């Protein structure tokens, strides 16, 4: 059995209860999580890309928490780290290890992620409490795409920023590699917006 969720979490000094919960999730989802891409084309679009993306998002979250300590006074560190690890767990149903659309791709990884977490609701509540459970769901639901002005949790805001930065930098890194690490004279268009870099 692969244990990517536990492995990622063990790098961040999480509580024993959180690590046990990650181990339990690995029993059901570890193998497919290890094989899944993070996307079909934009970033980390290769078998195992989901682990790479998750690990990198977590690095950015850790930097945010350590650089801006006021965030740590307002959030539960274990909960934010756990949420970062599972924020894209729904991608195991959205994509296949062959980097194609999965059986339920039309449901999106947000809906699938919430469904997967709901199967473990009691275990999550035992570790994080009922409010913590819903904060984790808010991260899964609210981390993706443009951040709207509607009500969000601080946890989802932190993970959203880290997720966007990781996806954009991963894409830029791939684009630079594809050009032989040179920026074309007419600039390099960044797919995540109307930006060009020279």
How does the language model describe each region?
Residues 1-101, 146:
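Acidic/His-rich, divalent-metal-binding segments that scaffold phosphate/diphosphate chemistry
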Residues 30, 47-48, 137, 156, ...:
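Generic secondary-structure boundary/loop-capping signal
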Residues 170-173, 179-195:
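Extended, charge-rich intrinsically disordered regulatory tails
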